[in-house]
């Protein structure tokens, strides 16, 4: 099944121009993460962040997130780029930000992390699976524990929570409303109107 991408027509004094909706949003410094986070999606988000940084490093970027999560190493590539560039990044949860999506939501510029009123946010520990020889499984287990430690440290920094609380709360799926996520420190405000 192919996905439908809407197009918008923009009229100017020089004529009409057709844009796919994502390109039009990018003109307004808006990036949309919708769906599962994988290497392909992460590469697209990273490219958009780098493009907007090159356009104007002083202007904010609005990063809208509606994601069930995904591959943590893919999310780390987005996270590292968010911190690498100079532009402030407003993160806005629309719908849900779960797992790696919640991690990215919390990683926006402090004071500029938002949720819509009926959004759902969920944090948990990284998921993984391994097969093969016992040694291969042991290597993968050590790596997932290393990633869990890094993720918990970043989440503690982002939220202001103690590392022990993050570790305990992410032991299983931990769901929050927008308001609960605000109290937890994942977001700073609940939005009811556009950021304009």
Curated annotation (Swiss-Prot):
<comment type="similarity">
    <text>Belongs to the peptidase S14 family.</text>
</comment>
<dbReference type="InterPro" id="IPR033135">
    <property type="entry name" value="ClpP_His_AS"/>
</dbReference>
<dbReference type="Pfam" id="PF00574">
    <property type="entry name" value="CLP_protease"/>
</dbReference>
<dbReference type="InterPro" id="IPR023562">
    <property type="entry name" value="ClpP/TepA"/>
</dbReference>
<dbReference type="GO" id="GO:0005737">
    <property type="term" value="C:cytoplasm"/>
</dbReference>
<keyword id="KW-0645">Protease</keyword>
<dbReference type="GO" id="GO:0006515">
    <property type="term" value="P:protein quality control for misfolded or incompletely synthesized proteins"/>
</dbReference>
<protein>
    <recommendedName>
        <fullName>ATP-dependent Clp protease proteolytic subunit</fullName>
        <ecNumber>3.4.21.92</ecNumber>
    </recommendedName>
</protein>
<dbReference type="InterPro" id="IPR029045">
    <property type="entry name" value="ClpP/crotonase-like_dom_sf"/>
</dbReference>
<feature type="active site">
    <location>
        <position position="124"/>
    </location>
</feature>
<dbReference type="GO" id="GO:0004176">
    <property type="term" value="F:ATP-dependent peptidase activity"/>
</dbReference>
<keyword id="KW-0378">Hydrolase</keyword>
<dbReference type="GO" id="GO:0009368">
    <property type="term" value="C:endopeptidase Clp complex"/>
</dbReference>
<dbReference type="InterPro" id="IPR018215">
    <property type="entry name" value="ClpP_Ser_AS"/>
</dbReference>
<feature type="active site" description="Nucleophile">
    <location>
        <position position="99"/>
    </location>
</feature>
<dbReference type="GO" id="GO:0051117">
    <property type="term" value="F:ATPase binding"/>
</dbReference>
<dbReference type="InterPro" id="IPR001907">
    <property type="entry name" value="ClpP"/>
</dbReference>
<comment type="subunit">
    <text>Fourteen ClpP subunits assemble into 2 heptameric rings which stack back to back to give a disk-like structure with a central cavity, resembling the structure of eukaryotic proteasomes.</text>
</comment>
<dbReference type="GO" id="GO:0004252">
    <property type="term" value="F:serine-type endopeptidase activity"/>
</dbReference>
<comment type="function">
    <text>Cleaves peptides in various proteins in a process that requires ATP hydrolysis. Has a chymotrypsin-like activity. Plays a major role in the degradation of misfolded proteins.</text>
</comment>
<keyword id="KW-0720">Serine protease</keyword>
<keyword id="KW-0963">Cytoplasm</keyword>
